[in-house]
UniProtKB/Swiss-Prot annotation:
Part of the Ragulator complex composed of lamtor1, lamtor2, lamtor3, lamtor4 and lamtor5. The Ragulator complex interacts with slc38a9; the probable amino acid sensor. Component of the lysosomal folliculin complex (LFC). SUPFAM superfamilies: Roadblock/LC7 domain (SSF103196). One of its GO terms (biological process) is positive regulation of TOR signaling. It is found in: Lysosome. Its main location: other. Keywords: Lysosome, Phosphoprotein. Belongs to the LAMTOR4 family. This is Ragulator complex protein LAMTOR4. One of its GO terms (cellular component) is lysosomal membrane. As part of the Ragulator complex it is involved in amino acid sensing and activation of mTORC1, a signaling complex promoting cell growth in response to growth factors, energy levels, and amino acids. Activated by amino acids through a mechanism involving the lysosomal V-ATPase, the Ragulator plays a dual role for the small GTPases Rag (RagA/RRAGA, RagB/RRAGB, RagC/RRAGC and/or RagD/RRAGD): it (1) acts as a guanine nucleotide exchange factor (GEF), activating the small GTPases Rag and (2) mediates recruitment of Rag GTPases to the lysosome membrane. It comes from the Eukaryota.
Length: 99
């Protein structure tokens, strides 16, 4: 059974797993490759804290999203409603278009 907090995450194409965290980094929900991954939650929380600190340096745009791209997968991080949503998504390699 999915909760309203995670129902949209489960429908993301090529999704390999997800974490929903509180602002302090506590895991509220998880599934797939990221199920109960407290270590990754801590790392992501630190990265979010650093990204949020840029606002103090004069950047007026609030931090909302961050992508961490690796060769075969990407972590998509979004802050919404005092929660941090992390989705691990498989990168789909596409052939270049010839024109």
């Amino acid at each position: 059974m999915t909760s309203t907090m995670t129902q949209g995450l489960e429908r993301i194409p090529d999704q390999m797993g997800y974490l929903v965290m509180s602002e302090d980094g506590g895991v509220l929900a998880s599934a797939g490759d990221l199920e109960n991954d407290e270590r990754l939650a801590g790392v992501i929380r630190e990265m979010v804290a650093v990204a949020c600190s840029f606002r103090d340096l004069g950047d007026q745009q609030p931090f909302k999203r961050m992508s961490i791209v690796f060769g075969e997968h990407t972590f998509l991080v979004t802050i919404s409603g005092q929660k941090i949503y992390v989705v691990k998504r498989q990168n789909v390699v596409r052939e270049p278009i010839s024109v």
